[in-house]
């Protein structure tokens, strides 16, 4: 369910050493399955463990996950990264905003999942997003851009070189991607 790197485990173990004995960590999702879903990690003292929690045992600690958050934390990764600027804890949860769909789910659901879990997190850095409007009988995914992508001068490059390449690679049954957006350049546009 959740992978916690050795570096992150060591970081948590150091923090937990200063807490009440038996305290572990809790990994959770606020607003799971929603576009504004957020993941978090908190201390979990022994008296805060619920009977319905899933206990994930690691070498240096145990991570508790509540039953509502569990499906949205599938394939989540926690790491502790150090670079020239310092160190930081990273939590990647590709399924937090949308549950992972089955490999045999309808094409529309699988493409929507790829957009929400892989593409929109990248576009969010520019205040943008993309939505799947339909998949035509000819096999074209019809997308609509919003936020900072609407009116952005780089949207064609993003569509053809980024999104289309990624979707065609992942879904060979697609023939291409089309943009339905009526782009209006403005203050909201990224470029």
Swiss-Prot record:
Q: List the disulfide bonds.
A: none
Please give the SUPFAM superfamilies that the UniProt record associates with this protein.
Fe-S cluster assembly (FSCA) domain-like, HesB-like domain
Q: Where does [4Fe-4S] cluster bind?
A: 149, 152
What's a Pfam family this protein contains? Fe-S_biosyn
Task: Tell me the function of this protein.
Answer: Involved in iron-sulfur cluster biogenesis. Binds a 4Fe-4S cluster, can transfer this cluster to apoproteins, and thereby intervenes in the maturation of Fe/S proteins. Could also act as a scaffold/chaperone for damaged Fe/S proteins.
Which InterPro entries does this one have? Fe/S_biogenesis_protein_NfuA, FeS_biogenesis, FSCA_dom_sf, HesB-like_dom_sf, NIF_FeS_clus_asmbl_NifU_C
Q: Which UniProt keywords apply?
A: 4Fe-4S, Iron, Iron-sulfur, Metal-binding
Any note on cofactor binding? Binds 1 [4Fe-4S] cluster per subunit. The cluster is presumably bound at the interface of two monomers.
Q: What is this protein called?
A: Fe/S biogenesis protein NfuA
| An example Gene Ontology biological process | protein maturation
Q: Which GO terms describe its molecular function?
A: 4 iron, 4 sulfur cluster binding; iron ion binding
Names of required cofactors: [4Fe-4S] cluster
Q: Which PANTHER family match?
A: FE_S BIOGENESIS PROTEIN NFUA, IRON-SULFUR CLUSTER SCAFFOLD PROTEIN NFU-RELATED
| The protein's assembly and partners | Homodimer.
Instruction: State the family named in the UniProt similarity comment for this chain.
Output: Belongs to the NfuA family.
């Amino acid at each position: 369910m959740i992978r916690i790197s050795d570096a992150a485990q060591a970081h948590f173990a150091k923090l937990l050493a200063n807490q009440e004995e038996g305290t572990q960590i809790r990994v959770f999702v606020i607003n799971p399955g929603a576009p504004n879903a957020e993941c978090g990690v908190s201390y979990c003292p022994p008296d805060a463990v619920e009977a319905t929690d899933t206990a994930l045992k690691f070498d240096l600690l145990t991570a508790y996950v509540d039953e509502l958050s569990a499906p949205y934390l599938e394939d989540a990764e926690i790491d502790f990264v150090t670079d020239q600027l310092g160190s930081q804890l990273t939590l990647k949860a590709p399924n937090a905003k949308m549950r992972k769909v089955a490999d045999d789910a309808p094409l529309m659901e699988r493409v929507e999942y790829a957009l929400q879990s892989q593409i929109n997190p990248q576009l969010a850095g520019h205040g943008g997003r993309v939505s799947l409007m339909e998949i035509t009988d000819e096999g074209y995914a019809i997308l609509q851009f919003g936020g900072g992508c609407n009116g952005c001068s780089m949207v064609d490059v993003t569509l053809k070189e980024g999104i289309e390449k990624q979707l065609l690679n992942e879904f060979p049954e697609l023939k291409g991607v089309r943009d339905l957006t009526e782009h209006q350049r403005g203050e909201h546009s990224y470029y």
